[in-house]
Amino acid sequence: MQKVLAIVGPTAIGKTDLAISLAKKLNGEIVSGDSMQVYHEVEVGTAKATKEEQAEVKHYLVDTRSVFDEYSVKDFVDEATEAINDIGEKNKLPILAGGTGFYVNALLNKMQLGERKEEDSGTSQKWEDYLKQNGPQKLWDILNEKDPEAAKKIPVPNSRRTMRALTVIDRTGKKFSQQQKKIEPRYDYLIIGLNSDRQEIYRRINLRVDRMMQKGMLEEAKFIYQNRDKEHQVLQAIAYKEFFPYFKGEKTLNECVEQLKTASRRYAKRQLTYFRNQLPVNWFDPLNDPDCEDKIIKNIEAWKNE
């Protein structure tokens, strides 16, 4: 079975830097596990590796789509699987640098995501129409009736996950939660998780947002805002929608920046919760342990020799 190394953790913890360092030392190539880094129009807000970093180590699933393309978790899994096969054929180590927990999980494990795109999109359209007419609470109520265990793990505002669960239920006729329990691994994988003191992570997140503003975050957000009438996933991405009130003249720029920092901190907390509850992660602290990377490499070498 193909071995795959995954690097996960909250935003701003240093996943990209570690993935690049490990790729150089372990003869690896990187597959982005972030659902937003595929879009070539958005650079700053998605915190992609720089062009220089991408030149040093080959990256897959970065800048491969337009924000106006349809792109599902199934598309991600199909493309990432192809990338991992390519890397494996070169006798290199595939390194998944991931931020989006469900995408990472769906790739590493055989989750039911639909066999044909037509079926998947058709069923989803039904629930998207229902959401527009009735709102997230009533959508979630339906999931709660059909599958209370699945609903318990999905917050009411997360309509996309609610629709995904309902889509799987419609397509298979089985509870989403039951299918989640029967997951089989797709690869022989090792997951390295980065985490540290919460306040330090929050401080780094605040600094990252400030740097993003200096690099042109507002221009990217304006592009997304100007195209808000078109259906695309980036509309819901943290880093863009927080600035819509500024463009509407409802809030000051500083208020929106603070709102983005708050949203990013909450997202980091949700990331940690998902990885802790859904995946077998080996945790390390890169901010307080000077020997962190050496320990990680020892962990990886032991796994590679199994």
UniProtKB/Swiss-Prot annotation:
Listed InterPro entries: Dimethylallyltransferase, IPT, P-loop_NTPase
Alphabetical keyword list: ATP-binding, Magnesium, Nucleotide-binding, Transferase, tRNA processing
UniProt cofactor(s): Mg(2+)
Molecular function terms, GO-annotated: ATP binding; tRNA dimethylallyltransferase activity
Chemical reaction(s) catalysed: adenosine(37) in tRNA + dimethylallyl diphosphate = N(6)-dimethylallyladenosine(37) in tRNA + diphosphate
A GO biological process held by the record: tRNA modification
Binding site for ATP: 9-16
Keyword Magnesium: yes
UniProt KW Transferase keyword: yes
Annotated site residue numbers, Interaction with substrate tRNA: 100
Residues given in the record as substrate binding sites: 11-16
Interaction with substrate tRNA: region residues: 34-37
EC number, as in UniProt: 2.5.1.75
Function per UniProt: Catalyzes the transfer of a dimethylallyl group onto the adenine at position 37 in tRNAs that read codons beginning with uridine, leading to the formation of N6-(dimethylallyl)adenosine (i(6)A).
Record text on subunit structure and interactions: Monomer.
Record family assignment: Belongs to the IPP transferase family.
Protein name: tRNA dimethylallyltransferase
Encoding gene per record: miaA
